[in-house]
Structures are given as structure tokens and as C-alpha cells.
Amino acid sequence: MLSKQRVVITSGEPAGIGPDLVVQLAQQDWPVELVVCADPELLRDRAAVLRLPLTLREYQPGTDAQPQQAGSLTVLPAHLAQPVNAGELCVDNSHYVLETLARACDGCLSGEFAALITGPVHKGAINDAGIPFSGHTEFFAERARCERVVMMLATEELRVALATTHLPLKDVAASITRTTLHEVITILYQDLQSKFGRAEPHIFVCGLNPHAGEGGHMGREEIDVIIPALDELRQQGMKLTGPLPADTLFQPKYLQHADAVLAMYHDQGLPVLKYQGFGRAVNITLGLPFIRTSVDHGTALELAGSGQADAGSFKTALNLAITMIKSSNE
């Protein structure tokens, strides 16, 4: 039952719009209990600035979950190193940001929480604090000891997963191997089944090169790597179409049949999805032993505390996590 489920939320960079969005989430009822890992004073201060009602209660492990009521939040406390001014980064709070991610992740791994929804973090501030950090996806993979996870962004109409994520373009081709494709496509296929309720997922796969290599005249990765990998996976019963040129694949005649698209690199697939659904897209990490969704935007420091931040993507991420919980329990 959803009413017996808890999800954990991290508000992200404290100087950004994450705390604003969490306060906005609290203004409506939810069918699950929302537990926010954050500094309680940060949430109180931001609610006061936004002039929105907010009652906080401290999270008590071992108690029964209660569906969320408008105007209230359950808080799993973490404490800032320095006071926060909305819109002003302070690298001293970077350890606080990572502490919230670690505690939320550990709670999901232990079964304490049914899903994790993350607000936007500021990668630059964390790295400026001397902490190597490339993103949520890699952080959770390392903490959960997963050798491979897959980044996927989704709207209501389109899901795009990535064979590679945060790599310089010059390193992409060398990272596309048969082993990589086997692992990525297997995770994508299995999570479409278990977390999205797709019994026989149909995955469309982009080529790496222009025109998918043009028969080897514009690169041989399709011939030497991608096609053999797809053929091997088809022999396992997977329904795969491709490799197709990306400028051909992202058309309605193909997308209407696709449960997901696999792009070879970050900027091959995500610009199309974000153009189609920015503000409504959700970032999902596949391959983790728990459900993780996230907003599709950044910290928007200039909007923090202004009341102008749009909680649409956060609400969509939370709603998708709830839907995935349902599918996982069926």
C-alpha cells in the first residue's frame, strides 16, 4: 500500500532553489510520507521568505509511515556548516550537501525508504571545496557499489537513456564497447520491465557516427561494435531496433513504437528530450537497487528565495517515483 511507504527527498544546494521547491511540494497532500533530508532551519527560513505555511516534524525511524498532509513535512535533520543566503554559494556547505545524499542513499539501501528524489546540486561548488564530484549518478553508484548504472531522462512521451554520461566528446568512441553496450542495454531492459511495467520493452538504439557510420565510410563503430552487440542481445530475446542515425530515429514514426531510446552520448539524446519537455522531464538512475529520480534543471541561484521557481519538474519526479513504486510492487 502506498500509504505505508516513505520516500526520501534531498533539497540539494542550500543556496539554490531546491529548498524553495521542497517547501512548495509541502503545500499539497501526497499519498506517501515525504522525508526531507535537510537542515530544518533552512526549510523554516525559506518558507518564511516565501510566505508559505510549513510545520516540521522530526523523522522517527521505526514508526509507521503516514501519508503527507499539506503544510507539513517530516525532516531527517542534517546541519549546515555556515548560514545560507539565498542565491549566494558557500563552498563550506558542500560537505552538508554530500551528507544529505549519503544519508538518503543509505536509507534506501537499508529499505528504510522506498525511493529517493533529489533536488539540484551545484557541482562547481562541491569541486571548489576540494571534493571530486561529477554528479548524483556516479555518487550513488559508488555508494551502492554498483559497477554500472544508467542515466535516463524521461517525459510522458519519451525516455532517453545514455550509453555514456559525463565524458568529454573525444573520449566517447573509446568508451563504446560491446561490454558497455551489453551492460547498459541489459540494465535498461530489466528496469523497463521491473520499474516501468513494460513486459517486453522495445528499445531503439542510436548509432554513434553521422548517418550511423554510412556503411563504414563515416566511422566503423557501428559495424565493429554496436551491430554485433545488438545481435548478441537479440539472441537473448531482447527487442532492439538499430543502430539508426539519431536525426532519423527522433521522429514520430519511430518514437511511437519505442519504450526507450538509447543514445550513445550525453548531447546526442538529451537536447531533443529537453527541447520537447523541459520543466517536465525527470532524471532517473537505472541499475541501482532502489528507485532514484531527480529534477531536470540546475540550482537557478538567481531565483532562490524569489517565489518564482517552478516546482513542476520536482513534482513530476516525485509522481514518477510513486508510479515506479507501484510498478515494483505489482
UniProtKB/Swiss-Prot annotation:
GO terms for biological process: pyridoxal phosphate biosynthetic process; pyridoxine biosynthetic process. It catalyses: 4-(phosphooxy)-L-threonine + NAD(+) = 3-amino-2-oxopropyl phosphate + CO2 + NADH. Pathway: Cofactor biosynthesis; pyridoxine 5'-phosphate biosynthesis; pyridoxine 5'-phosphate from D-erythrose 4-phosphate: step 4/5. It is found in: Cytoplasm. The keyword NADP applies. Disulfide bonds: none annotated. GO terms for molecular function: 4-hydroxythreonine-4-phosphate dehydrogenase activity; cobalt ion binding; magnesium ion binding; NAD binding; zinc ion binding. Its EC number is 1.1.1.262. One of its GO terms (cellular component) is cytoplasm. Binds 1 divalent metal cation per subunit. Can use ions such as Zn(2+), Mg(2+) or Co(2+). It holds the Pfam family PdxA. A divalent metal cation binds at H166, H211, H266. Keywords: Cobalt, Cytoplasm, Magnesium, Metal-binding, NAD, NADP, Oxidoreductase, Pyridoxine biosynthesis, Zinc. Its main location: cytoplasm. InterPro entries: PdxA (IPR037510), PdxA_fam (IPR005255). The active site is located at the dimer interface. Homodimer. Belongs to the PdxA family. Catalyzes the NAD(P)-dependent oxidation of 4-(phosphooxy)-L-threonine (HTP) into 2-amino-3-oxo-4-(phosphooxy)butyric acid which spontaneously decarboxylates to form 3-amino-2-oxopropyl phosphate (AHAP). This is 4-hydroxythreonine-4-phosphate dehydrogenase. The lineage of its organism: Bacteria, Pseudomonadati, Pseudomonadota, Gammaproteobacteria, Enterobacterales.
